[in-house]
């Protein structure tokens, strides 16, 4: 949905609408991607246990924890690709992908053949590919659209809220795991409860800290109901 909106604003030469659409797209993607990365890192052990079993899962857990940052980079690169395409710069993301792929191949071969990092080299090389895409796209967006990225409410705020959420989830899951001792599905129960509670806490923190305003809530599905709910909890004034 981002590309048509940007294309219309760009065709009308409405720079204000273009910048507004770009800002909203990046902000909303980071609001989702940053806590997702934190959640995958914190909950990597129970998630791997549920998917593949707990036996000999230490390496897989570590891979998920290390690679979770890639969620942020891939999300940002996907959005920035759409921004460039929606503003009539169709070939630039392709060129950036080719450049990033070349860097990825060189880094991957170095990690595997020089540093002998094994599968972890693949994880880090994949993240470097996504990071390069983000970097190249960001430079082009700034140069072509004269767009200056806001940092506080787009990156710093969600990161702080996600960090609090991550600490909360870590301790809550540990407590639930001990409470459910003897219960056959304690990993599943602990994971589901922790994820739901952590999501609720993160949403409350976003609203309370002003990372999301009442006006911006209306852009979400069931926005009016969410606004009324947060006002009842006195998280919105």
What are these regions (language model features)?
Residues 24, 37, 46, 71, ...:
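Residue-level recognition of pore/gate-forming positions within transmembrane alpha-helices
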Residues 21, 26-42, 119-144, 159:
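Short alpha-helical transmembrane segments in multi-pass integral membrane proteins
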Residues 29, 64-67, 71, 97-98, ...:
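Residue-level recognition of transmembrane alpha-helices
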Residues 173-237:
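Membrane-proximal transmembrane or re-entrant/amphipathic helices at the cytosolic face
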Residues 1-26, 81-83:
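Helix-loop junctions and terminal segments of transmembrane helices
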Residues 40-71, 181, 185:
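Interfacial segments at transmembrane-helix termini and the short loops linking adjacent helices
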Residues 91, 101-139, 143, 149, ...:
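Membrane-interface helix-loop junctions in multi-pass transport and translocation proteins
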Residues 69-99:
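Membrane-interface junctions at transmembrane-helix termini in multi-pass inner-membrane proteins
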């Amino acid at each position: 949905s981002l590309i048509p909106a940007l294309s219309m604003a760009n065709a009308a030469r409405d720079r204000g609408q273009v910048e507004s659409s770009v800002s909203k797209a990046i902000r909303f993607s980071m609001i989702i991607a940053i806590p997702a990365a934190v959640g995958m890192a914190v909950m990597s052990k129970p998630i791997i246990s549920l998917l593949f079993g707990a036996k000999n899962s230490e390496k897989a857990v570590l891979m998920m924890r290390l690679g979770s940052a890639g969620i942020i980079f891939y999300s940002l690169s996907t959005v920035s690709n759409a921004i460039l395409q929606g503003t009539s710069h169709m070939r630039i993301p392709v060129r950036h992908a080719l450049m990033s792929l070349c860097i990825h191949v060189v880094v991957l071969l170095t990690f595997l053949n020089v540093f002998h990092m094994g599968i972890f080299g693949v994880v880090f090389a994949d993240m470097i590919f996504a990071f390069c895409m983000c970097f190249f796209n960001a430079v082009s967006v700034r140069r072509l659209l004269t767009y200056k990225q806001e940092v506080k409410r787009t990156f710093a705020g969600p990161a702080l809220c996600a960090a609090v959420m991550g600490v909360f989830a870590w301790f809550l899951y540990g407590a639930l795991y001990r409470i459910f001792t003897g219960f056959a599905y304690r990993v599943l129960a602990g994971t589901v409860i922790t994820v739901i509670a952590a999501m609720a806490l993160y949403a409350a923190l976003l609203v309370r800290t002003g990372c999301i305003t009442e006006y911006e809530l209306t852009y979400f599905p069931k926005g009016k109901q969410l606004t009324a709910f947060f006002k009842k909890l006195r998280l919105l004034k």
